[in-house]
């Protein structure tokens, strides 16, 4: 159930076609979870500043049941910052990513939970 959310001040017109699909495939590979369970939400055109500057930036979160922890998070950061830099032209030093290890009982899906 990994869920990756990107809030960014990059305009919608600058988000390339296929970006959501690329994020889905890359996260599936990185987490080892099936792509059909990966959710991606990109929220462009936000009023945002990072370090007092309105240059392109992103505030992100990755939620997952398991597969969250020190070494894994560093790997995800490298992957996700790289994709944001390459596709949205956001410098990695203008990106924060918060990681959340979710309890399966606290994640609802398909009329139930993952517990």
Swiss-Prot record:
Name the Enzyme Commission number(s) assigned to this protein: 5.3.2.1, 5.3.3.12
> Which residues participate directly in catalysis?
2 (proton acceptor)
**Is the keyword Cytoplasm in the record?**
yes
Reaction(s) catalysed by this chain's protein: 3-phenylpyruvate = enol-phenylpyruvate; L-dopachrome = 5,6-dihydroxyindole-2-carboxylate
Listed A to Z, the keywords are:
Acetylation, Cytokine, Cytoplasm, Immunity, Inflammatory response, Innate immunity, Isomerase, Secreted
PROSITE patterns associated with the record: MIF
InterPro entries noted in UniProt:
Macrophage_inhib_fac, Macrophage_inhib_fac_CS, Tautomerase/MIF_sf
Q: Which GO terms describe its biological process?
A: carboxylic acid metabolic process; cell surface receptor signaling pathway; cellular senescence; DNA damage response, signal transduction by p53 class mediator; inflammatory response; innate immune response; negative regulation of apoptotic process; negative regulation of cell migration
Localization, per the record, is:
Secreted; Cytoplasm
Say where the protein is mainly found: secreted
Q: Which PANTHER family match?
A: D-DOPACHROME DECARBOXYLASE, MACROPHAGE MIGRATION INHIBITORY FACTOR
**Role this protein plays:** Pro-inflammatory cytokine involved in the innate immune response to bacterial pathogens. The expression of MIF at sites of inflammation suggests a role as mediator in regulating the function of macrophages in host defense. Counteracts the anti-inflammatory activity of glucocorticoids. Has phenylpyruvate tautomerase and dopachrome tautomerase activity (in vitro), but the physiological substrate is not known. It is not clear whether the tautomerase activity has any physiological relevance, and whether it is important for cytokine activity.
Recite the other comments.
Answer: Serum levels of MIF are elevated in patients with severe sepsis or septic shock. High levels of MIF are correlated with low survival. Drugs that inhibit tautomerase activity protect against death due to sepsis.
The similarity comment for this entry is: Belongs to the MIF family.
As annotated, the protein's associated disorder is: Rheumatoid arthritis systemic juvenile: An inflammatory articular disorder with systemic onset beginning before the age of 16. It represents a subgroup of juvenile arthritis associated with severe extraarticular features and occasionally fatal complications. During active phases of the disorder, patients display a typical daily spiking fever, an evanescent macular rash, lymphadenopathy, hepatosplenomegaly, serositis, myalgia and arthritis.
Q: What is this protein called?
A: Macrophage migration inhibitory factor
- Taxonomic lineage from the root: Eukaryota, Metazoa, Chordata, Craniata, Vertebrata
């Amino acid at each position: 159930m990994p869920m990756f959310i990107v809030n960014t001040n990059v305009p919608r017109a600058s988000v390339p076609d296929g970006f959501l699909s690329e994020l889905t495939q890359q996260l599936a590979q990185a987490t080892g979870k099936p792509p059909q369970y990966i959710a991606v939400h990109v929220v462009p055109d936000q009023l945002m500043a990072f370090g007092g500057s309105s240059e392109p930036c992103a505030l992100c979160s990755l939620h997952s049941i398991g597969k969250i922890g020190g070494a894994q998070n560093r790997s995800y950061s490298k992957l996700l910052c790289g994709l944001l830099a390459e596709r949205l032209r956001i410098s990695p030093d203008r990106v924060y990513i918060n990681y959340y290890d979710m309890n399966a009982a606290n994640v609802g899906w398909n009329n139930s939970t993952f517990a």
